[in-house]
A protein has these predicted regions:
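Cap/insert and terminal regions of metallo-dependent hydrolase folds
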Residues: 133-219
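Conserved beta-strand hairpin/beta-sheet module of binuclear metal-dependent hydrolase folds
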Residues: 1-24, 131-149
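Metallo-beta-lactamase
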Residues: 16, 21-27, 31-43, 58, ...
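Active-site metal-binding loops of divalent metal-dependent hydrolases
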Residues: 5-8, 40, 66-67, 125-126, ...
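Short acidic/His/Gly/Ser-rich catalytic and metal-binding motifs that mark active-site loops
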Residues: 11-12, 70-73, 152-156
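Core dinuclear metal-dependent hydrolase active-site scaffold
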Residues: 1, 106-137
Length: 219
């Protein structure tokens, strides 16, 4: 299974290498039977479908119901800006073949999308943005943050700083403050889509508020 699906071909040749990296790791896209989306922004869902063809033909796509309704079941499109309409079209294009095949499975706020995987509603970046929790038998956990953080410096010290892609800046600031405090107190691993390599680590308190401590890795 996968958590998020990358950009596909939407953002140029420097991105969209998920399938290639899967193959380099010894896996094929048709072996993936589930993809859980943290949210439906194009850099997280664009890799689901390329040129109308599903890239994970044997996978169910799991997404928060609140997120699905915002992007797919949304009404009042005439009043939206051209940029928002473009984002909505990308969302529809990414999910269309899976919707047609009845392979999109929606989960409620804070519900488990799959066995051993939980979710935490972290709204603001998008209405249904959810962090995904990998539960282990020994009580440890790894929380896939999604877009709680957009870098390893400013927002750790200033959680109220938001980016243009955040749907609700006030909500995302509160979400980020909560997520950082919980990660520091819980001492669990977090994985951030926009954190620098290796992208996995811990949150620690420091003199300026928080800092990211990357997880040690072996080449």
């Amino acid at each position: 299974m996968l958590i998020d699906a990358g950009t596909g071909t939407l953002f140029g040749s420097a991105a969209g290498k998920l399938i290639r990296h899967l193959e380099a790791s010894g896996y094929r896209a048709d072996q993936i039977d589930a993809v859980i989306l943290t949210h439906i922004h194009a850099d997280h869902s664009g890799g689901l479908t390329v040129d109308g063809e599903p890239q994970f033909p044997n996978a169910n796509i799991h997404v928060a119901d609140r997120e699905y309704r915002f992007w797919i079941d949304r009404e009042g499109l005439a009043s939206l800006t051209a940029e928002v309409k473009k984002d909505l079209q990308r969302a529809h294009d990414a999910l269309a073949p899976y919707i047609a095949a009845d392979k999109v499975k929606r989960f409620a706020d804070n519900a488990d999308p799959l066995p051993n995987f939980g979710s935490i509603l972290r709204p603001g970046h998008t209405p249904g943005h959810s962090s995904i929790v990998l539960k282990t038998g020994d009580g440890q956990r790894l929380v896939f943050w999604g877009d709680v953080i957009h870098g390893d410096y400013v927002q750790f010290d200033e959680p109220d700083v938001f980016v243009t892609f955040d749907v609700d800046g006030k909500a995302v600031a509160a979400t980020r403050a909560t997520a950082l405090a919980e990660a520091a107190d819980g001492r669990y691993l977090v994985a951030g889509a926009h954190l620098p390599f290796p992208g996995i680590g811990h949150v620690a308190r420091d003199s300026t508020l928080y800092r990211f401590v990357p997880w040690n890795y072996v080449e």
